[in-house]
Amino acid sequence: MQSEQVFDSIKARLLNDDNLADQYRALFTLKAIGQKGDRRAIEAIYEAIQKSSSALLKHELAYVLGQINDSYALPHLNTILADESQDVMVRHEAAESLGAISNLDSLDILKKYSADQSLDVSIRETCDISIKKIEFDHRPGKDTDNDNEENQIPVIDPAPATKSSDSNAKDVKNLRDIYLNDGLPLFERYRAMFGLRNIVLNSTSSQDIHTEALNAIADGFTDKSALFRHEVAYVFGQIDSPAAIPCLLKVLYDENEHEMVRHEAAETLGGLGADSKTAKDALIDFANNQSAPKVIRDSCIVALDMLAYEQSGQFQYADGIEKA
């Protein structure tokens, strides 16, 4: 457990609205602290949600509460989801985090907001996905049915990846068919999306299979659901492939695209920009463009800080303890 002095220093950085990029670094330091069971991190993150004026930061704060995966955060997430003054992105992330923690007690509030037709569709869709994830996680016989595969990256996905057998062309086609079928529940399509992601990340996949799966994921940018499209951009960040840069730039520059999707594309480009001067230049342009939506400008500021970290050789992005 961190000393009170060190912890207070990290918390102060998180609450300092003068430097958004530094707030992100402090947040991910607190995430690591919270994942070790120190609940002071949860309280500090919730305090930041109450005090921050940045929808981008607040949505990331809500996301981290879910990734810490401690039921202690549930009352805070319930409050955020119910708060009509919060941005849609923030409430959506609170709903997703309830699914990440996956407590059966969360089903009632998720069902309430899933059925509320007055809410933005992204919130309702997220609630529905989280309901299905919790029910899936608590299904009878889950320990023996072998219905999902172990995650290849250290995150809690909104839906568990569909397991593929051999990472071959048939697997890619089957997953793609589910992934792009807008007549299916988003939960099942998300599962297919993460299954395709895992095929790309699988080191034993051939280059042809890798490319097929990557192209299949990119096809998701044509979907009618902004929530779905934003998850596509997020998954490209997990894949960390320079091949995704052209389609992400197209999304970022599309003024008709939902801000939720454009901001996710910007942050993903921050992780890929070291491989592309075009990507870096685009992020710089948007970060300095006062006519661009604030959430996109802020995303580009954070993305450029991530890019600077990638190019600096620093040991870790979450540097709060080092700076405390």
Predicted region positions:
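Structural detector for internal amphipathic alpha-helices that build alpha-solenoid repeat scaffolds
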Residues: M1-Q2, A21-K36, E47, L56-D70, ...
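Amphipathic alpha-helical scaffolding segments comprising HEAT/armadillo-like alpha-solenoid repeats
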Residues: M1-L15, Q35-Q50, D70-A82, N103-Q117, ...
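Short inter-helical turns and helix N-cap capping residues of alpha-solenoid HEAT/ARM repeat scaffolds
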Residues: D18-N19, S53-S54, E84-D87, Q117-S122, ...
